[in-house]
Regions:
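Alpha-helix capping/helix-boundary segments
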Residues: 46-47, 78, 152-154
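Acidic, PIN/NYN-like endoribonuclease modules and their adjacent C-terminal/linker elements
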Residues: 2-20, 27, 132, 139-145, ...
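Short, well-structured N-terminal submotif of metal-dependent ribonuclease cores
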Residues: 1-74
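Short, flexible helix/strand-to-coil boundary loops that buttress conserved ligand/catalytic motifs
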Residues: 51-52, 86, 158
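PIN-domain endoribonuclease scaffold, especially VapC-family toxins
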Residues: 64-121
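Basic nucleic-acid-binding interfaces
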Residues: 2, 33-36, 110-114, 118-120, ...
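Active-site neighborhoods of divalent-metal-dependent phosphate/nucleic-acid chemistry enzymes
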Residues: 110-146, 151-153
């Protein structure tokens, strides 16, 4: 039975939670690592954009993740970065959320994402030291794509490691 498409972050978080509770089984490791499904890391600015507006490509990527159209890779340092940024008072106010809803959203995001253990630290590679954890998650997780709204800071490192940089809209279009 098709569900109504959620139109804000709170509704999407709840829909993701219902999906997870309804299925009660997570896909096997083999199923999660299918070579036909692109592996990507979402930069923090993509999640911030999704939290601020349900109208853009960043928010649409969350639906694509929910529908398993790509594998989102996340490491512990990157998850902590997501939480720190999404819980900032100015981010909560901009997205009309509270800290509890941000944490619930990230809890569900963790259920859908594939964890990456950072075996190698490649620092320094990016123009902004705060972006290193994003790049390291992509490299250690075998991502094909790093999805960001800030391609400039990653451009040289991405070229060195043959990592595709795409904005949310470009990545969404590449999913078909």
């Amino acid at each position: 039975m098709p569900r109504e498409i959620p139109n804000d972050l709170g509704q999407l978080t709840f829909a993701l939670y219902l999906d997870m509770m309804g299925n009660m089984t997570l896909p096997s490791a083999a199923a999660r690592l299918q070579p036909t499904v692109p592996r990507a890391v979402l930069d923090t600015n993509v999640l911030v954009a999704a939290a601020r507006s349900s109208l853009g490509a960043s928010f649409a990527l969350l639906h694509a993740l929910r529908n398993r159209r790509f594998i989102a890779l996340v490491s512990v340092p990157l998850m902590l970065e997501y939480e720190a940024v999404l819980s900032r008072p100015e981010q909560l106010a901009a997205g009309s959320r509270n800290a509890e809803s941000a944490v619930k959203f990230l809890d569900v995001f963790c259920l859908l994402a594939t964890p990456v253990h950072l075996h190698y630290l490649w620092r320094p590679q990016t123009r902004d030291p705060a972006d290193e954890m994003v790049l390291e998650t992509a490299l250690n997780g075998g991502a094909q794509t790093l999805v960001t709204l800030n391609e400039r800071d990653f451009a040289i490192a991405a070229a060195n490691f043959k990592l595709k940089l795409q904005k949310p809209g470009e990545f969404l279009r590449s999913l078909g």
